[in-house]
Amino acid sequence: MRILITGVTGFIGGHLAERLNGAGWAVRGLARAPEHAAALAAQDIEIVQGSLLDRGSLASCMYACDAVIHAGAWTGTPGVPEDEAWTTNVAATGWLLEAARQARISRFVYLSSVAAYGVNRAPVIDETARTPLVGQLYPDSKIAAETLVRGAGEQGLATTIVRPASTYGPRGGAWTIGPIEQIKAGSLVLLGKDEGLVNTGYIDNFVNGVLLALSSPAAVGETFNICDGVTTTYRDFYMRYAAMLGKASLPTVPAFLARGAATSPGRWLRRLMGKQPPGPWSVHFRFNPSRFSIDKASRLLGYTPSISLDEAMRRTEAWLRDAGYLAAGETG
């Protein structure tokens, strides 16, 4: 069985490629810059050059494949024009779906995001919750792409949508290396008590869930939240990284200042705080009161996260130390 993975040079895509390769799949990874996939190529993973912005390369790279995991996306990288970001996340998904239909692909798994739930603040959010447009590029693009995936499913393509949450672990960017580097630079601040909830998704748990979604007949036509199914506070999550760096505390700003500085009229507050605060979308998540339910994935796929937060952080710290992000004198 041969599978195409987009976004293979990314955190999630790379881990999926390695796991599927180890499970006996013939893995083909789409990479805009193949040199960034040298470690995967060294494991006999086929790397083909192409871009989500190049419709022709998306069709050609699907030759002789049986399945697709679409993990590639614009995830908020600054400096990318809005039309390019939208094309990457939405139009390219449509092109991939069309190419998959033409190639008679047997399974198509799309990695979306819990950001599709928008500003829903219910205590527990499952897959039946509405996904309204919120006027923010990233979540709105994920909602639009999901609509295309469902449409392709109605036309006969065996599709599944997976919504990850805060996925972290070895090689992770936004939820692993990012916080470590921000803490080192003194730019990561706690917002008041920072008791908003992080819906963690340790990478090995998440990959297990995606593989179940890929292989289970019960997943066809369905949408799943895939994360650890438990929460911790932002304060606890970030303080675990701080402890790895030998820090007992982090800079804190009052919550009301953070909320105000995230608004357009809050420029004076940004100067007062002396730091670049999170934007409105980030602030929403920092004060998030919700847990994303994985009951559906458990019921239909048999998904059970096996690695606890404590064990996941232990493994993550070991990788950070081996990779040189934690100095020899820093102790966790």
Roles of regions detected by a PLM:
Residues 87, 91, 121-167, 188-192:
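Catalytic helix-loop patch of NAD(P)-dependent Rossmann-fold dehydrogenases
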Residues 95-137:
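Conserved Rossmann-fold NAD(P)-dependent oxidoreductase catalytic core, especially the SDR/UDP-sugar
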Residues 169, 191-196, 224-231, 242-246, ...:
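Glycine-rich Rossmann NAD(P)(H)-binding loop
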Residues 212-277, 294, 314-317, 327-330:
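Mid/C-terminal beta-alpha module of Rossmann-like enzyme folds, strongest
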Residues 50, 232, 240, 276-332:
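C-terminal amphipathic/interface module of NAD(P)-dependent oxidoreductases
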Residues 144-145, 173-178, 192-214, 221-225:
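Substrate-positioning beta->alpha
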Residues 3-23:
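N-terminal Rossmann NAD(P)H-binding glycine-rich loop of SDR-like oxidoreductase domains
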Residues 36-41, 45-88, 99, 117:
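NAD(P)H-binding glycine-rich loop region in Rossmannoid oxidoreductase-like domains
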